[in-house]
Design a protein with these regions (language model features):
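Active-site mouth of glycoside hydrolases
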Residues: 25-154
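Bacterial Sec-dependent signal peptides at the C-terminal "C-region" and cleavage site
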Residues: 14-28
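Bacterial N-terminal signal peptides that target proteins for export
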Residues: 1-8
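N-terminal Rossmann-like NAD(P)+-binding domain of SDR-like oxidoreductases, especially those catalyzing
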Residues: 11
């Protein structure tokens, strides 16, 4: 029997949500002492949006034909060198629909690289902004001077 990773993640999330809501103190604000203790245990978060320089959009970042671990490693290394420790990374439903196993493998590879550079990741699941049409495969060239010129609706 083949398991769908998306369904497993959704089921795990629902169970975790239900289990977490059983706590009676979940709705109580933290004391100043508890908040200060939590903050003292966590480094200051400094980061940015991340997409490797070799990818015009989230499809090129994640599809097998253009996934570029070497560039990701190099650029996350640069981020670490200047003190960044968190990245916001956009996922692609188009890649998920066309090659789900490879997509999960690429996410795992990205996370391994990010961990090597002590960088946490905030994934954005299937953003639906920017260019309304997206297609799997080769992507258009960037438009000079326009930020995210090839970003696609997801």
């Amino acid at each position: 029997m083949k398991h769908n990773p998306f369904i497993l993640v959704a089921l795990f999330s629902l169970v975790s949500l239900f289990w977490g809501c059983q706590s009676s103190d979940i709705y109580q604000p933290w004391s100043k002492e508890k908040a200060k203790a939590w903050y003292a245990e966590h480094p200051y978060r400094a980061g940015c949006n991340f997409q490797p320089s070799t990818a015009i959009n989230q499809i090129e970042m994640w599809q097998s034909a253009t996934f570029d671990a070497a560039t990701i490693d190099r650029e996350l290394g640069w981020a670490e060198e200047i003190g960044l420790n968190v990245m916001r990374v956009y996922l692609s439903s188009v890649v998920w629909q066309n090659e789900p196993e490879a997509f999960i493998q690429h996410i795992d590879e990205y996370l391994t690289i990010a961990d090597k550079h002590h960088i946490k990741t905030l994934f954005v699941f299937f953003d639906d902004c920017w260019n309304p049409e997206s297609t799997y495969g080769e992507q258009p060239a960037p438009k000079p001077g326009i930020h995210n010129s090839g970003w696609v609706q997801d």
